[in-house]
From Swiss-Prot:
The chain crosses the membrane at residues 24-47, 56-77, 99-118, 138-156, 194-217, 235-257, 271-290. Disulfide bonds join C95-C187. It comes from Homo sapiens. GO terms for biological process: detection of chemical stimulus involved in sensory perception of smell. Pfam families: 7tm_4. Odorant receptor. It is found in: Cell membrane. This is Olfactory receptor 2H1. The gene is OR2H1. PROSITE patterns: G_PROTEIN_RECEP_F1_1, G_PROTEIN_RECEP_F1_2. Residues 48-55, 119-137, 218-234, 291-316 are cytoplasmic. It is a multi-pass membrane protein. Residues 1-23, 78-98, 157-193, 258-270 are extracellular. GO terms for molecular function: G protein-coupled receptor activity; olfactory receptor activity. Glycans are attached at N3.
Length: 316
């Protein structure tokens, strides 16, 4: 069946019934996007320039920052255009590209956050063997697996979603082209797509989240066996930032991809979708830097607020 909507594209409704809210959201989204660009670029730059950040933890953090930059850039420019003006259309090709990239990068983040939880588990529970277990080659392998698996997932799910028989009104009740909103737009049988969405949600959302919780459960047990307040504070400082990011990201993803079928849940899902597409990438740099002394020190050096010689910089 030929997709009748492909010549004209789609109409992204967003919150078009509330023009005043759209103006406010434009300012919020634009500000968040700027914070995302500046914050994540700084983390990548510091991870490259500062030798003490040449470790697995910051390798994965810089990978997450690069991912967040791509993640937001794939959808925010189109979102800003739709929020600012009366034109809220997106071409079929544009929707296809956005869906493919957004789905791939979102899946990558789910897997990468799991890898980072494993890294923190080894750092806390196996500190003496950390360098042996989490070596540079393994870091590259784990990061590559995350990107390749997400690419395969997007290659499988994107075509089947775009080949649905869409309703003639072509109105997507969302800010961007996502699998759940496109399934709701279909006027045909969506049983296969709903099963596919459920299976992929279990594999790439439920399973990674379960592994993250299991790793932190094991980490908590190991920390409780240590009768040292200093060790507790160090373990908390090591894991709290990542656990905060996991909570923000996964709570939003679950609200979008595992929501019940009712109008209230779908309306609420738009807010959560907006948050995990725009909010979490802008908050991630803040969360990771607020309690991280190494990144703070590197940032002060980059800004010239610490007058260290070139030799002390290299020695660090």
């Amino acid at each position: 069946m030929v997709n009748q909507s492909s010549p004209m594209g789609f109409l992204l409704l967003g919150f078009s019934e509330h023009p005043a809210l759209e103006r406010t959201l434009f300012v919020v989204v634009f500000t968040s996007y700027l914070l995302t660009l500046v914050g994540n670029t700084l983390i990548i730059l510091l991870s490259v320039l500062y030798p003490r950040l040449h470790s697995p933890m910051y390798f994965f953090l810089s990978d997450l920052s690069f991912l967040d930059l791509c993640f937001t850039t794939s959808c925010v420019p189109q979102m800003l255009v739709n929020l600012w003006g009366p034109k809220k259309t997106i071409s079929f090709l544009g929707c296809s590209v956005q869906l493919f990239i957004f789905l791939s990068l979102g899946t990558t983040e789910c897997i990468l956050l799991t890898v980072m939880a494993f890294d923190r588990y080894v750092a806390v529970c196996q500190p003496l063997h950390y360098a042996t277990i989490i070596h540079p080659r393994l870091c590259w392998q784990l990061a590559s697996v995350a990107w390749v698996m997400s690419l395969v997932q997007s290659i499988v799910q994107t075509p089947s979603t775009l080949h649905l028989p869409f309703c003639p009104h072509q109105q997507i009740d969302d800010f961007l082209c996502e699998v759940p909103s496109l399934i709701r737009l279909s006027c045909g049988d969506t049983s296969y797509n709903e099963i596919q969405l459920a299976v992929s949600s279990v594999i790439f959302v439920v399973v990674p989240l379960s592994l993250i919780l299991a790793s932190y459960g094991a980490t908590a047990q190991a920390v409780l066996r240590i009768n040292s307040a200093t060790a507790w504070r160090k373990a908390f400082g090591t894991c709290s930032s990542h656990l905060t990011v996991v909570t923000l990201f996964y709570s939003s993803v679950i609200a979008v991809y595992l929501q019940p079928k009712n109008p209230y849940a779908q309306g609420r899902g738009k807010f959560f979708g907006l948050f995990y597409a725009v909010g979490t990438p802008s908050l991630n740099p803040l969360v990771y830097t607020l309690r991280n002394k190494e990144i703070k020190r590197a940032l002060r050096r980059l800004l010239g607020k610490e007058r260290d010689s070139r030799e002390s910089w290299r020695a660090a």
